[in-house]
Amino acid sequence: MKKLLEGKTPANEITENLKKEIKNLKNDGINPTLCVIEVGDDPASKIYLRVKRNLAKKVGINEVGLHFPADTSQAELLGKIKELNQDPNINGIMVQLPVPPQIDPRAIFETIAPEKDADGFSPLNLGRLWEGQSDIIPATVRSILTLIDYYGIKMAGKNTVIIGRSVIVGKPLAAVLLERDATVTIAHSKTKNLADLTRNADVIISDVGKAHLVTEDMVKDGAVLIDVGMNRENGKLMGDVDFDTVAPKANAITPVPGGVGPLTVASLMKQAVILTRKQHGR
C-alpha cells in the first residue's frame, strides 16, 4: 500500500472552511438553518444524529430537530415536510433514515423541495446529476469525491467498478464519475462473476455492507479501493474490503473506520451551506 486514504484530515479542513464561510454569511445577516427530522427511536440513528448536531453547532449552522413517534403516518410526515418547504427560515431539510415501515422513503425524497434537499435524494436533483448540472450531491458521494480530489486520484479513463446500486450511493456516484470521464461498471447482488470485473478494475468502490466481500484475489496490483461498507464482526468495525490482505496490493485504500465515514457529516453541513447560498443568490 502506497497511500492510506484517511478521511479525518480533509474532514477537519472542510470543517474549518465552513466555520469561516458561515461566519461571513452571518455577518451579512444570513443564518444557515438545517431541519433534521427523526421518526421513531432507532438506536443507530440516535448516535448519528448526535454527531450531526455536534458538528452543526461547531461550524455555526442552526440545527432544528423535529422528532415524530414511530407510529406517525406517512401523510402526517409529508404534511410537515410541505410546511417546512414553505418556511423561509429553513434552508435545508433532511429525514434521518431508516424510517418505520409504514413510510416510503421515496415519498419523502419526492416531497422535500429540491432547493432544500440537504441529502441530495430528490428525483430532480438526482436527474440533474446525470446531466452534469447539479452541485447538490448525496453526502456519501460528496465524501468519496472529496477523498478522490484530496489525494489527487485521476479518474479519467480509469476502469471503475462500483459495487452497490443504491439511490443513495451507487447510482449517483456512477453519474458523477462518468462526468469525470471514468469508465464505470455497476455491480450488484445479481452480478455474475464479480471477481472477473474487479480484477480488471483500476478503482473499486464498494457500498454493500458485507464483510470480506472484496478479497486479495479479486484485486489487481496497484488498484485504488474506496470502502463505504460498514459491518461489525466479533465486536470489530470493518468495511466490505478485506483490508489486511488487500492493502499490500493496493496503490491506495481507505481504512474502515476512518476513511469515508469522517467526511459524511461534514459533507452534509457543506451541502446545507450550498443550499443557503443558492436561496440567497450567492
UniProtKB/Swiss-Prot annotation:
GO terms for cellular component: cytosol. One of its GO terms (biological process) is purine nucleotide biosynthetic process. It comes from the Bacteria. InterPro entries: Aminoacid_DH-like_N_sf (IPR046346), NAD(P)-bd_dom_sf (IPR036291), THF_DH/CycHdrlase (IPR000672), THF_DH/CycHdrlase_cat_dom (IPR020630), THF_DH/CycHdrlase_CS (IPR020867), THF_DH/CycHdrlase_NAD-bd_dom (IPR020631). Pfam families: THF_DHG_CYH, THF_DHG_CYH_C. Pathway: One-carbon metabolism; tetrahydrofolate interconversion. Gene3D superfamilies: Leucine Dehydrogenase, chain A, domain 1, NAD(P)-binding Rossmann-like Domain. The keyword Oxidoreductase applies. Its EC number is 1.5.1.5, 3.5.4.9. NADP(+) binds at residues 164-166, 189. One of its GO terms (molecular function) is methylenetetrahydrofolate dehydrogenase (NADP+) activity. Keywords: Amino-acid biosynthesis, Histidine biosynthesis, Hydrolase, Methionine biosynthesis, Multifunctional enzyme, NADP, One-carbon metabolism, Oxidoreductase, Purine biosynthesis. It catalyses: (6R)-5,10-methylene-5,6,7,8-tetrahydrofolate + NADP(+) = (6R)-5,10-methenyltetrahydrofolate + NADPH; (6R)-5,10-methenyltetrahydrofolate + H2O = (6R)-10-formyltetrahydrofolate + H(+). Belongs to the tetrahydrofolate dehydrogenase/cyclohydrolase family. Homodimer. PANTHER family: C-1-TETRAHYDROFOLATE SYNTHASE, CYTOPLASMIC, C-1-TETRAHYDROFOLATE SYNTHASE, CYTOPLASMIC-RELATED. Catalyzes the oxidation of 5,10-methylenetetrahydrofolate to 5,10-methenyltetrahydrofolate and then the hydrolysis of 5,10-methenyltetrahydrofolate to 10-formyltetrahydrofolate. This is Bifunctional protein FolD. It comes from Lactobacillus gasseri (strain ATCC 33323 / DSM 20243 / BCRC 14619 / CIP 102991 / JCM 1131 / KCTC 3163 / NCIMB 11718 / NCTC 13722 / AM63). The lineage of its organism: Bacteria, Bacillati, Bacillota, Bacilli, Lactobacillales.
